[in-house]
Amino acid sequence: MRDRGKLVIWPVYLDQTKSRSSGRIISRKNAIKEPQLNEIKEAARQLGLNPEVEPHKAYPKSWWEVSGRVLVDDNGPKTVIAKQIALAIKKMRGPESSAKA
């Protein structure tokens, strides 16, 4: 059942190594390499989005890979929230991750 007022953030949305057709929804410049669920959860918590982690879910386009997902409060467009989460993760990872990007 779908939670009202929540957005689903799949790790593939933020993954720099994925193409747009594979599911990435933000630009490569703003994306991060191999985002982890705990990083997404922590970034969403810092942004005040009340994250809920569902670790045993699989992204429908790649149903054989169980990547998990994070539900966050719906405070605006999904792409804007995904970009904010990715930038927060970049900040948490430190300067070495942005130098590689």
Swiss-Prot record:
Chief location bin: cytoplasm
One of the GO biological process terms: SRP-dependent cotranslational protein targeting to membrane, signal sequence recognition
NCBIfam families linked to this entry: PRK00754.1
Superkingdom assignment: Archaea
Keyword Ribonucleoprotein annotated: yes
One cellular component (GO) term of this entry: signal recognition particle
One Pfam short name: SRP19
Keywords, alphabetical: Cytoplasm, Ribonucleoprotein, RNA-binding, Signal recognition particle
Native organism: Methanosarcina barkeri (strain Fusaro / DSM 804)
PANTHER family to which the protein is assigned, alphabetical: SIGNAL RECOGNITION PARTICLE 19 KD PROTEIN (PTHR17453), SIGNAL RECOGNITION PARTICLE 19 KDA PROTEIN (PTHR17453:SF0)
Oligomer and partners: Part of the signal recognition particle protein translocation system, which is composed of SRP and FtsY. Archaeal SRP consists of a 7S RNA molecule of 300 nucleotides and two protein subunits: SRP54 and SRP19.
Family: Belongs to the SRP19 family.
Protein function: Involved in targeting and insertion of nascent membrane proteins into the cytoplasmic membrane. Binds directly to 7S RNA and mediates binding of the 54 kDa subunit of the SRP.
Localization terms from the record: Cytoplasm
Protein name: Signal recognition particle 19 kDa protein
